[in-house]
Amino acid sequence: MPLMSNSERDKLESTLRRRFFYTPSFEIYGGVSGLFDLGPPGCQLQNNLIRLWREHFIMEENMLQVDGPMLTPYDVLKTSGHVDKFTDWMCRNPKTGEYYRADHLIEQTLKKRLLDKDVNPQDMKNMEKILTTIDGFSGPELNLVMQEYNINDPVTNDVLDALTSFNLMFETKIGASGQLKAFLRPETAQGQFLNFNKLLEINQGKIPFASASIGKSFRNEISPRSGLLRVREFLMAEIEHFVDPLNKSHAKFNEVLNEEIPLLSRRLQESGEVQLPVKMTIGEAVNSGMVENETLGYFMARVHQFLLNIGINKDKFRFRQHLKNEMAHYATDCWDGEILTSYGWIECVGCADRAAFDLTVHSKKTGRSLTVKQKLDTPKERTEWVVEVNKKFFGSKFKQKAKLIESVLSKFSQDELIRRHEELEKNGEFTCQVNGQIVKLDSSLVTIKMKTTLQHIREYIPNVIEPSFGLGRIIYCIFDHCFQVRVDSESRGFFSFPLQIAPIKVFVTTISNNDGFPAILKRISQALRKREIYFKIDDSNTSIGKKYARNDELGTPFGITIDFETIKDQTVTLRERNSMRQVRGTITDVISTIDKMLHNPDESDWDKSTFGLSPVKI
């Protein structure tokens, strides 16, 4: 599983910038770290990725797409937990003012020290254990590692300040008054949760179902580095699959049962040793309990299929299970789809079981029911604690406040009702808080008792399985995995993009300038447009070899060349990017061959598809 050398990575990133796949934003003003612009080929590749993602997930699973605003009110993200918990730990150089993200600085330093030939075996083992478990470290634990290993500023060796917590959301205000505090969203998921009732209605009240969103999210990175991998504004695609908490099976699980996936479990990581992931089928992983349920397993398998289809190397991918103290505040289990690049393992997809966290907290905060009502085939008895108010005395005592107090009482959990019942039995009264005021209630006003009712409807808050994709990171990993250098010429790099993801499918060029060529160019262009094949005309005066090299750097899989023979017999050459092999045929046959390879996966094999065309000796 060889990785790119630093020189190869420099060559990759030079190619990406030279061919304007991307460039630093506001570059002529000096740029801003963590912000990038996609150029034409980058945009087209991103468009292809989104289209394939929609086909693979939204269309295949009949998902309901939602598109919400990037601006999110403070209350929403306070309720979701992001205001308090969407943080990283950082340290500052008091002399230079430079900030570092603590866990990244530790990783960078310890990896460098592990390369030292004089490091003793015990220190090596300790450092390797830290590196395999650091994602789950708390702030104080990171601080201890910084002190124990005497980690200073990597550039100046200055002693750094103690760690501090930093919230990663961009804060703003909505409206001229500036009184409505808001943030740029850190995820697209909240818009899906808040629209749950509407989505449920569209799905005719039935569970399970899934919604999906594709859009920009924001993260105010402490010290963005590694190019497109760690940025402050990024494109996400998120799925929220709503499921009955008592039944997390999946109707299509048998279709992926035998999908073999590399899994790095929590147990392997906690062993403290550098471990390779274990390859097993998703069926085995679910049956053994390593993966919590069928629905989570189903989406992990589908994610694996998708990533391999778009050009990710199967030997450089794994699912890594979060450690207990690493999981997000909303998750009960989570597996990260990680891709190995020249920068190391990069988290690109998160598959999390969010349980009922989000719907529960938003329902509690707003007083709006976010539940599913399921009609029972057989009614069931339910015994529970209930609170009943004496309407006559309650209304006369509290007047306009009566309904508000009654609403607060109705939201008491079973544990709260038991506690209040005990207080009522012991003291003859209990208190509760309503809008910041203490309200005293006695047995003449309320009764708390056990009550048995016959239920015809089961009402519950659904659980959520969430696959979340960082599309920008995936795009960089495609670049990393698809970049190759010609064996006979180290200066000639090219991208071996799969046909479906390639930004430009065909480039059309001429061997030289000739009065007869423009009409043929026009004919070929019209034929390609008619078949909806994205192409580019290269009519520059440069040599044919340089034209091939330039379009190889754009990852264009096919090249059509018009030459003097074309004028005589209407034949052209068709060149394949990876092998540089060429065949010759009529314009109609060549375009038909390209169309077949692009639009029919079973016909994508070069030898099979070009069987009727004449090989060209180079």
From Swiss-Prot:
Subcellular location: Cytoplasm
Residues passing through the membrane, by range: none
An MF annotation (GO) of this entry: protein dimerization activity
Single biological process term from Gene Ontology: mitochondrial glycyl-tRNA aminoacylation
Catalytic activity, as annotated: tRNA(Gly) + glycine + ATP = glycyl-tRNA(Gly) + AMP + diphosphate; 2 ATP + H(+) = P(1),P(4)-bis(5'-adenosyl) tetraphosphate + diphosphate
Superkingdom, taxonomy of origin: Eukaryota
Positions that bind glycine: 187, 238, 466-468
Residues annotated for ATP binding in this entry: 219-221, 230-231, 347-348, 473
InterPro entries linked to this entry: aa-tRNA-synt_IIb (IPR002314), aa-tRNA-synth_II (IPR006195), aa-tRNA-synth_II/BPL/LPL (IPR045864), Anticodon-bd (IPR004154), Anticodon-bd_dom_sf (IPR036621), Gly-tRNA_synthase/POLG2 (IPR027031), GlyRS-like_core (IPR033731), tRNA-synt_gly (IPR002315)
NCBIfam families hit by this protein: glyS_dimeric, PRK04173.1
PANTHER family xrefs: GLYCINE--TRNA LIGASE, GLYCYL-TRNA SYNTHETASE/DNA POLYMERASE SUBUNIT GAMMA-2
Subunit structure as annotated in this protein's UniProt entry: Homodimer.
Protein name, as recorded: Glycine--tRNA ligase 2
